Design a protein with these regions (language model features):
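An acidic, glycine-/histidine-flanked metal-binding catalytic module
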Residues: 4-10, 14, 20, 141-286, ...
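Flexible glycine-/small-residue-rich
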Residues: 81, 122-124, 149-151
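Short helix/loop capping segments that flank catalytic or ligand/cofactor-binding pockets
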Residues: 89-90, 129-131, 155-158
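Short Gly/Thr-rich strand-loop-strand
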Residues: 103-124, 128, 132-137
Length: 390
């Protein structure tokens, strides 16, 4: 790859041309956080906009420009998860929320341990792309953002590893013993991630054997649960069913994967309280179809039991497509005889002048509020629509 093809920008040039409003970073973080909250995962979410200094440093190191290669992490979002098995679940949520271009993961070998993280490159939603200065796209900067997913155990050491080893290889030259020692720490963290999930799975199985249904659900699914107590009639049904059937309802709940439950929570058109009752109700609606449970939950109105309405709740869902209905229609006649033209104006010309006059009044009245109003009218096309991305 020839040096002539490399593109380098100065910090001052990038600072002058690349303008990213805070709303871009904030909205991406909000969209992701809302989806994770909706399904009850334990997580922390952070975001950042790349500084001009950081971009200049990266352009100096990488071969941007060659084969149209562009910087893809102008905006970055980091998701830290508490359970290792939630990484794949979170990846699926991202893929169902954004236009994902591709994923990459840490290279791992038998000789070396590194912080395990999953990096995704996603296309910016159009409404957020339009907020960024247009000069940005004239440079070798892609209209994408980066999502990084990793566990909390590795998050604790990732920044140290990134700065002290990835960017500081000279520290470890001729000191292989210290490097192996550092690797052993990272190996311990990886073992902790796996062991934590195994611990709760084993605990959940023991709770199932003991008939402690609420605790079994909490340990097995490991989601943020509300304070709702298991309905007595549901507990009684699970007890009776456990005594009579080999493939009883409680066992079927325990054998249901966390991914299946998360999918059901995300597919609801409205956010539901997450507790032991709604979990069983969701699994029954989608997997078990037990008429006895259906009757109990219908009587209890389970999905509204304990609901706390919030003004921000609508942020969790995509807006449904609007249906076109004629609710008002008026026929207007414009008298063009008073137009001072050398020749008689056509109907189209009369209409255009009338439209310009009306729009001129609107701009004069509201132009101060809406800075992006077009300067003139244009022909309406039925295939033009606005797309709002939640």
């Amino acid at each position: 790859m020839s040096e002539q093809k490399r593109v380098i920008y100065t910090k001052e040039e990038l600072a002058a041309k690349v303008k990213v409003p805070a709303i871009v970073e904030q909205d991406l973080k909000r969209i992701i956080s809302d989806r994770l909250e909706q399904c009850g995962l334990y997580y922390r979410c952070f975001s950042r906009i790349k500084t001009a200094s950081s971009m200049a440093h990266k352009f100096a190191l990488k071969d941007y420009g060659a084969e149209n290669k562009k910087l893809q992490d102008l905006v970055g979002v980091r998701i830290n998860l508490y359970f290792d098995d939630d990484v794949e679940i979170c990846q699926n949520i991202v893929e169902n929320t954004f236009d994902v271009i591709g994923w990459s993961t840490s290279e791992r070998s038998e000789e070396e341990f590194k912080p395990t993280k999953l990096n995704g490159v996603c296309r910016l939603p159009e409404y957020l792309r339009s907020e960024i200065s247009t000069e940005t796209w004239d440079m070798y900067i892609d209209d994408t953002f980066e999502i990084q997913i990793k566990t909390m155990f590795f998050e604790g050491w990732h920044e140290i590893e990134h700065d002290m080893r990835y960017k500081g290889e000279e520290l470890w030259k001729n000191y292989k013993g210290f490097s192996r020692y550092f690797n052993s720490i990272l190996a311990t963290l990886e073992l902790c991630d796996k062991s934590m999930v195994t611990l709760f799975e084993d605990l959940g199985h023991s709770l199932y054997k003991s008939g402690r249904w609420s605790d079994m659900i909490k340990s097995h699914f490991r989601l943020k649960l509300g304070e709702g107590q298991l309905y007595p009639e549901v507990a009684k049904l699970l007890d009776e069913d456990c005594d009579q059937q080999v493939e009883n309802l409680a066992k079927r709940i325990y054998k249901t994967s966390k991914q299946t439950l998360v999918d059901q929570l995300l597919h609801r058109s409205r956010k539901v309280p997450i507790n032991v009752n709604t979990i069983i109700a969701l699994l029954n609606d989608s997997q078990f179809h037990d008429s006895r449970l259906t009757a109990i939950f219908k009587e209890r109105d389970v999905y509204n039991d304990g609901r706390e309405e919030s003004l921000g709740e609508s942020w969790h869902y995509e807006m449904k497509p609007l249906i076109r209905h004629n609710v008002f229609q008026m026929c207007t006649q414009v008298d063009g005889s008073r137009l001072k033209e050398e020749k008689t104006a056509s109907a189209a010309e009369i209409f255009q002048q009338a439209a310009d006059a009306i729009y001129g009044w609107i701009v004069g009245k509201y132009g101060g509020l809406f800075k992006e109003m077009p300067q003139k009218t244009s022909t309406y096309h039925a295939d033009i629509c606005l797309l709002y991305t939640s």
